[in-house]
A protein has these predicted regions:
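Helix N-cap/coil-helix junction residues
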Residues: 9, 66, 170, 211-212
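Secondary-structure end/capping motifs
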Residues: 134-211
Length: 229
């Protein structure tokens, strides 16, 4: 959402979900000579522009005391990044689930660092402001439906695994790893001041390292749910 807002796209944050800390990571090959995040200097790192992994990589570089000029970012979507990773034409890959578990199981990838090093990681649900303004009750029902689905997953683990496997085409063992990482429960809620502040800090970091061209105010795009009668 940060990149879209910085590009003046119309959007509204309608909800958020806590992301499991180990659901995204920076991967290296099993035979990699990279031992620490400081060793990323000069390395080719694949990441999808504007994704949560883009955010993760920005935080990793900051933690390592490196800049974007210190690395060679390779902008690739997950499928292309996986192919490059398998051919070892990249040195590291910033990625999220289920691609993370698939690479760990099939390519024996190693985790250099994951989200456990960075608290306050969230996944967001975004809506069209015009639709939300016209149909606020429908937006609230959408969030309610997601939470009903979350409760169903909790109570029907075998069926949830079957549905997830069939809908994604993942191997059952990989799908199970992804589900096992999932927070239980994993409620979707409207944004709290703490979540807005955390997202604002990321936006400020992105501006500081010139990943976005200007300052943005996250709060200005946050949807407020209608009050219950």
């Amino acid at each position: 959402p940060i990149f879209a807002q910085a590009a003046d796209k119309e959007l509204s944050y309608v909800g958020y979900e806590q992301v499991p800390a180990n659901a995204q990571a920076l991967l290296i090959a099993k035979n990699s000579t990279i031992d620490s995040i400081q060793d990323l200097k000069g390395k080719r790192i694949a990441v999808q522009r504007g994704s949560s992994a883009h955010e993760l990589l920005a935080k990793v570089l900051q933690k390592a005391g490196l800049s974007w000029q210190d690395i060679q970012p390779i902008w690739l979507p997950p499928a292309d990044a996986r192919a490059a990773f398998d051919k070892q034409s990249i040195d590291a890959w910033a990625i999220w689930e289920p691609y993370l578990s698939a690479a760990e199981q099939d390519a024996h990838a190693k985790v250099l660092i994951d989200g456990t090093a960075f608290p306050q990681t969230y996944s967001f649900y975004i809506g069209n402001p015009k639709f939300i303004q016209a149909y606020p009750e429908a937006t609230a029902q959408f969030i309610h439906g997601l939470n009903q689905a979350d409760q169903w997953v909790l109570k029907n683990q075998p069926q949830a695994l079957s549905v997830y496997t069939q809908s994604t085409g993942l191997q059952p063992s990989i799908a199970q790893r992804v589900i096992d990482k999932r927070l239980k429960p994993s409620p979707i809620q409207t944004l709290t001041p703490e979540v807005v502040q955390a997202q604002q800090q990321i936006a400020d970091l992105f501006q500081q390292v010139q990943l976005i061209p200007k300052h943005i105010q996250v709060q200005s795009t946050v949807w407020v749910a209608p009050s219950k009668p």
